[in-house]
Structure formats: C-alpha cells, structure tokens
Amino acid sequence: MKTRDNPLKMQVEKNVVDIVTIAGTRPEIIKLADLVQLLDGQGNHALIYTGQHYSDNMKSIFFDELKIKPDYDLRCDTSDVATLKENMLKYLREIKPPHILVYGDTNSSLAGALAAKEVGSTLVHIEAGLRCFDLSVPEERARIKIDSISDYLFPPTELARTFLSYEEIDKNVTVTGNLVVDVCKRLAKVADEYGRHYDLPDKYLLLTMHRQENVDERERLEMLRKHLSGIEHKIVFPIHPRTKNNLSRYGITLPPNVIAIEPAGYLEFLYLLKNCQLVMTDSGGVQEEAIVLRRPCVTLRHVSERWETLLLKANVLFPLHRRDPLSDVIEMMLDAKIERNPYGENVAGRMLHLIKEITQ
C-alpha cells in the first residue's frame, strides 16, 4: 500500500524518523489515533501497520474515520509472531529508529517489541501492566514478555503499576491513563450522524463476541444461544464474520430477540454503545469504552484484565459455561450506577509530553 506518496521512504532518505509506532489490529488503531496525530505533528514519526487484522474494508473504515494513515502497510495478514517480526525487520533495519512504541498485548505488539530489541531501539510499551493472571490466555503471555523487555512502561492506572511492581519492574514506569478515553469521548460526540441509518428498538442490549474460545466451538455457541433466548430484552448483535460463519457451520440459529446486523465501523459502534442499556462482550476494549460512556458491561469470559471496571462494579464476569441464567445477571447490572471513569483525561497530550522527554 502506498500512502502519502510513501512518506516513510522519504523520511528514511532524510534520516529524520526518530519514533516508529507499530500497530496491526482494530483496538490498537482506535486507541492510538489521537496520539498518532500528535506525533505526526512533530514531523519525526512514522506509523507501521502490520495488517494483522487485514482487509480493505477495515482499513478504509478505521483509517478514514479516525483520520490517520499508515506510513507503511506491511500487509502481513497473519497473527504469526515470527512472520510479523521478520516483515517489520526489513524496514526497521533500514530506518534504524531510535525509539519504537508498541501498544497492548497483540501479536503485532509482541513482534514489534522483539524487533525493537533486535535493531537496538529504545522500546516504549503503552498500556503496560495489565494482568488477568491466567497464563492460558495468549495475550497474558504476550504482555508479560513485552513488559519484561521494555525500556519505558506506561501503565494506564495505579493498579497496573502495582502489578508491574510485583514482577520487580519499577524503573521508568509512569502512570499515564488510557488513550481510549480521548478517542472515545471525542468521537462519541459525532457518532449520531453515523448511526441514524439503523432501525433499532428504543431500548436494547448490545452484544459483541469474537474471541476464539467463544466462537469456534459448537458447545460454546449453543450455550450462547441458550443464554440469549432467556433474556427478555431485544439484543443488537453486530456479528463478526467468523462468528457468523461458525453459527452457519454448526446449524445454530440465533433466538428471535437477537437482531443480527453487519459489522459496524467505529463511529457506528460508538452510536450503538452510547444508546444501549447494557453491553455484553468478550472484548477488552469494549469493557473500557463501556465505562467511559457510563454503560454497564457483562464480560463473557472467566477472566478480565480490566480490574478497575470490575472493582467499580461497572462490569461483571459471566463465562458462557455458567449454569445460572445470564438474564439474572443482566437484570442486576441494568441497575448499576457508574460514577466515574478510572482511565484519566487528556491522556494523549500527557503521553506526548512524556515521549518528548524520552526522545530528547
């Protein structure tokens, strides 16, 4: 993909790339949007998009809506860490950036962190310190590894910093808040014009589900159907293609109270989220967005890295194998009073200041 007349190559020739940000998935792109715009304004920054979540539709939806463009698109279309790293190294060895930023716990982030160490760049890990304390979760293993090799760590909360200290990671650790706050609040203000085309009930619950352990097994999908059929409320479900294909493959039909719609762009999704009564999800990012927009959340997993949302009683865990009715938990959470957002304000601006201090 050639973007901005391939400015990355132009910057390489001028030898002015000081900071490279690496991203490859929807959550990373969303959360990094405001920070990337600020870094681009400094004139010494390049964004590498790995294509871990690759599709022309996703790129156009997210990059156009979020007003950012990758300087280089690797089009890897894979989640294999070794392949992602090798593709990055082709360009990082040429650029030799002094600093590399990675976000969160994706395979793109892990590959970027490993590549940074290989080329000798200073590694900054944004969203450091999240822990679910279950090593069977691939993201848990990734974030532990990334944190262990990072030169600077930006945990979003004091609790995340505490988790790092348990692992004896105390040097160059700064609590920054969560970048999702800036993007979510800014775009929620304009989301209505992107959601007007939906024909939705006045009151509805929102459902998102994409994790492999939930959507790839017939038994889990049958459990989902059973739980959803016991809920009296209408449920709007922007259905992930993987989930849709597996439902069809197993011959499982959604109950009548579920309104399945096409996958939503980010602004469309914010419209659905801000107008719902409650969201059910297995997404870490949606747990964060829900509390920012003061929407109760039920997380369809047995663990969560977003402890703050659980401690504030804005979120509750409900793994699909539970025998008690999901409907009972829904009714309880509909009365949840969400009084504050634990993730800070003006996070991108604060983070830019910290990055400037590191790179000077």
Regions found by a protein language model. Name each.
Residues N44-T83:
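Conserved nucleotide-sugar phosphate-binding/catalytic loop shared by glycosyltransferases and other
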Residues D73-C76, P155, T174-T176, I259-E262, ...:
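Short acidic-hydrophobic, aromatic-tinged amphipathic segments that line or gate anion-handling sites
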Residues V102-Y103, L110, L114, H125-I126, ...:
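A donor-sugar binding/catalytic signature common to diverse glycosyltransferases
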Residues F63, L159, A314-Q360:
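Leloir-type glycosyltransferase catalytic cores
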Residues V20-A23, E28-L38, F62, D73-E168:
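Active-site and donor-binding regions of nucleotide-sugar-utilizing enzymes
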Residues K2-G51:
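N-terminal subdomain of nucleotide-sugar transferases
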Residues K2-L8, Q52-N57, R75-C76, I146-V215:
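A nucleotide-sugar donor-handling region in carbohydrate enzymes
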